[in-house]
Amino acid sequence: MNDPTTPLMKQWAQVKRDHPNALLFFRLGDFYELFFDDAVIAARELQITLTARNKEKGNSVPMCGVPYHAAENYISKLIRRGFKVAVCDQVEDPKLAKKLVKREVTRVMTPGTTADSQLGSEENNFLAAVASHGDFVGFAALDLSTGEFRATEFKGSDARRRIQEELLTLRPREILYGSSLPLFDAARPANAVSGAMPKLATVEGASWAETPLEDWVFAPDYAIPLVENHFGVLSLEGFGLANKASAASAAGAILHYVRQTQRGSLHHVDRIGFYERQNCLVLDAVTVRNLELIEPLFTNTGEGVTLFRALDATMTPMGKRLLRAWMLRPSIDTSEINARLDAIEMQVVDTLGREELRRAMDGILDIERLLSRVTLETANPRDLLALAQCFGRLPKVRAAMQRFTSARFLVLHGLLDDLADLRDRIFTTLVDEPPITLNDGGVVREGLDAALDELRNLSHNSKQFIAQIEERERKRTGIGSLKIKFNNVFGYYLEISNANKHLAPADYERKQTLVNAERFTTPELKEYEAKVLDAQEKIVEIERRIFGELRTAIAAEARRVRQTGLALAEVDVLANFAHLAATRNYCRPKFDQSGEFELIEARHPVIELPELTGSADRFVPNDLYLNATTHTVIVLTGPNMGGKSTYLRQAALVAVMAQMGSFVPARSARLSVVDRVFTRIGAADNLARGRSTFMVEMTETAAILNTATDRSLILLDEVGRGTSTYDGLAIAWACIEFLHARTRAKALFATHYHELTVLADELSGVKNYHVSVKESGGNVVFLRRVEPGAADKSYGIEVAKLAGLPAEVIERARAVLKEHESVERQATSHLSKDERGSDSMQLTIFTPLSQKIVDQLKETDLNRLTPIEALNLLHELKKQLD
């Protein structure tokens, strides 16, 4: 950095030294200016002009600037790109400054602490922290924009993996960690260096800014008292954190960081919850992605083709966020689930009441985020007025809720405060249409403060008073063109043309000479100017005080306001579920302890909606039955495009919806609670981390086999296709046997390996199903019905024909297939039909040439093999073939 020489640049350098890792927005008059490297970065990122100071002196200082009234938009862009921004404001009136205007950093904004109005309404903006103590790794996350605060911790060798899984699900914007704590295996750009450039990390599609802090910030002796003091308690036992030192330390580190970067009371952060993943239906990042819960797998399908978009008809921003939260963490508590279902059922049968309730919530803005700006002291007059308007709708919401007497609605009705006292105070304090800022006054309603009214009267009557002086001076001087004007440099002055300046009285004091006129003042005019300007300054001062008192009063009631926002969010989601159930013919799922999972005429909640998919085809519903004994694994065969993947996904989506507490798209649903949903659907190379398609497939499959329980639901689609036919078939075979014998989880296994269908004859819990196809005139019609039994062929060539492969290729493929089918029939002609297992026309890998290997396999107890042992056996068998 060049040595600053002017007093202004010395002041800038002193502030910058305190915030070396932030872009410094330095207030100069009506602009925020940035200098040196900050200016170069900001000009590039914001696409604004880069200029320089002191060019002529040979000591050029790069600089750029943005208007102060538009700064929030520019700052938001930088925050979204991972930068930190320190805002340095003028904290005294430039007119009153004796020398250099005093400036201070009034706020520091980071990706994880921003609470600005441009945040997406449906998602949280989490700041996370990771703390490690011995065998424990603690994790905490705070959404400063809403006040949501949570913490957990894990123990053992897989603790860091589970924390990473939590991060991938939660997707925070910023992570705090001890400077000596190694973080996760992540892709980090080369620009992740010291200075203002953000330190960004990307892990499996999720990106966040990384902020290292000194290790002492995470020390329990320092961090835990911060949490206790914030909540005003002697012990964290009431929050479930009494013996969770790592989790509490992570939470304390967050509070430390927020206190350093923000001002305000943080009254809206009024609670913290300890949670454990096993207390909800666990959906890891792979499952969330594969089921397209929040984001589509392929962007060209449009942002609407997700479960969230399909289920989101909420009326409020808080409802959207709660819907998303319930979707990512469905309940496993049947009492909680049924309480929600009871509330929904009562609304489904009362159409008028349901719609009245939804209309009452329509137009309610983001109470949680408006409140956060109040407590952080960044709320402007329009924010407070917006809050009051939201509060004004609450009596209608409470009145509409009285029609519904389910237990959960009665609780929510009691939690929902109409906040009439705060509403009335805001309305009686602020004008109907206040300006955004307090800089020019005009915010406080007339009649509220006598001193303010008196000053306003003086200021507002200035035009009339000046007109009277002007008319009097015209008569006294005989100058008909004499005018009294005002500007910010000279204040009030009398302007006389050159032709009449000789008529100016002796008591006129010359202020400025122009080409065509002279400007004068008088003692009377100077005295009045001082009164008017002083009045305007005092008006702004009084209005700031009154507004500050109002904002403080609301912040003091943050607990009431936030509780109302949370209750309103739940009312909104439950009314939303009732609306969907009534308009889409959903049914109420019934939960029991039988271990069964039975769906009658179930539908895919997204694909059945033509407004999202753009398809005019009628969706074909299907049944599904799984249990803990005779139907634990379904082997699903059939052609591509037949609907296998849709069938798998809709089973999982129904489970997720049901445990969110929603009605589901089916004629009937009888379910047992699921503890985890696993998916292995599709494949994608991760070459950046040296992982091939097959390695990704095997890693995900291994995680499923190692962690699934007998209460899990597993979806496996084409396991083994990422390698050779023989290897893939062997792995798929071993996986089914392992699922059947070891995990006893409910599993749907879609495959093109028709050889796997013989397992249904050997394993009591395995059942064959297929997606049906109709052949007509050499063409195939996909009926998309799932029926018992194995498919008789794959129809791969027919699908290739539909895809438009050249006729020559199709004909050659038919000839090759016919030749291989002939070889297969000859190879198995000595076997009985029972020994062959079926009349399948698929190629078999068990020919006379490999009879020795077949015998070896028959002698092997596959039920006692682990997946790794199965792979080793496969390797040995392949060596024999070679």
Curated annotation (Swiss-Prot):
The keyword Transcription regulation does not apply. ATP binds at G638, P639, N640, M641, G642, G643, K644, S645. One of its GO terms (molecular function) is mismatched DNA binding. One of its GO terms (cellular component) is cytosol. It comes from the Bacteria. Keywords: ATP-binding, DNA damage, DNA repair, DNA-binding, Nucleotide-binding. GO terms for biological process: mismatch repair. The keyword Aminoacyl-tRNA synthetase does not apply. This protein is involved in the repair of mismatches in DNA. It is possible that it carries out the mismatch recognition step. This protein has a weak ATPase activity. NCBIfam families: mutS1, PRK05399.1. Belongs to the DNA mismatch repair MutS family. This is DNA mismatch repair protein MutS.
